[in-house]
Amino acid sequence: SKGLVGLVIPELSNPIFPMFAQEIEQLLASSGHTPLLCTQTPGGTSEDEYIEMLVERGAAGIIFVSGRHADTSGDVTRYQRLRERGVPLVTINGNAPTIKAAAFATDDRAAARIAVEHLISLGHRRIGLAIGPMRMVPAQRKHSGYEEAMRSGLPDEPLHVVETLYTYEGGANAAQLLLPQGCTGIVCGSDIMALGVIQGVRSGGLRVPEDVSVIGYDDSPLIPMTDPPL
C-alpha cells in the first residue's frame, strides 16, 4: 500500500454521502492507497478526534467531505495544523476562504441559477429557496445563484428564502413557510430536503408538480424512483 488515507464524512443517513464514500474509496484503492472511512454521528467521534487518530497512524493524507471546512464561522486552525505537520488534505463541498487546501465542489451558484431560470421558463413568478445554514459555503453560493437569477428574470419579485436543515424534516418545514407566501416553485439545497418539501406540499392539500414545482440538488440514486421523480 502507498499509505493510509482518511475519508472524513458526515452521517450516512443522507444517501449522497455513501455515494461520495464509495467513489472516493474506489479511486483510492485503484491508486494503491488504503482508505479509512471516518463517519461522524451525533455524540460519536468528532472530526478533531478522527484527525488526531489519523495523524497518529501516519496517514498519507486526509479527505474531508462536507465538514467544518465549509463553515465560514468555524475554527479552521485544525486544517492549518495539518498543513504545518505536512499532512496533505483535500476538501470537498465548499471551503472557507481562510483554508489553504486543494478544494473541489460542484458549482452551487450556477446550479441554483439554472434551477430558477428553469422555473421562470415554466411560468413561475413566486419562487422560493430552501437551503441549509447560511454560514456554510454551499448555502451561500446557492443563495447567490438564486438571487442573481431572480434579480435578472423577476426584478420586481421579492426573494423567498428559508434557512433550515438539510433533512427531510427541514424540507417539510420550509414548505410550510414558503407555501403561505404564494410560492409555486421551490428550489431545494438537497434531494432529501426536496422530498420533505414534497410531503409538506401534499400535507397542504396541493399537488406536485401540478400545483407546485420542486427541484432538488444532489442527483441521489433513489430520487428517480420517487413519486414524482425529481
Regions found by a protein language model. Give the residues of each.
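Short glycine-centered, acidic/aromatic-flanked micro-motifs in structured strand/loop junctions
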Residues: 7-9, 66, 131-132, 207
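Bacterial carbohydrate/catabolite-sensing allosteric modules
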Residues: 26-31, 55-58, 76-230
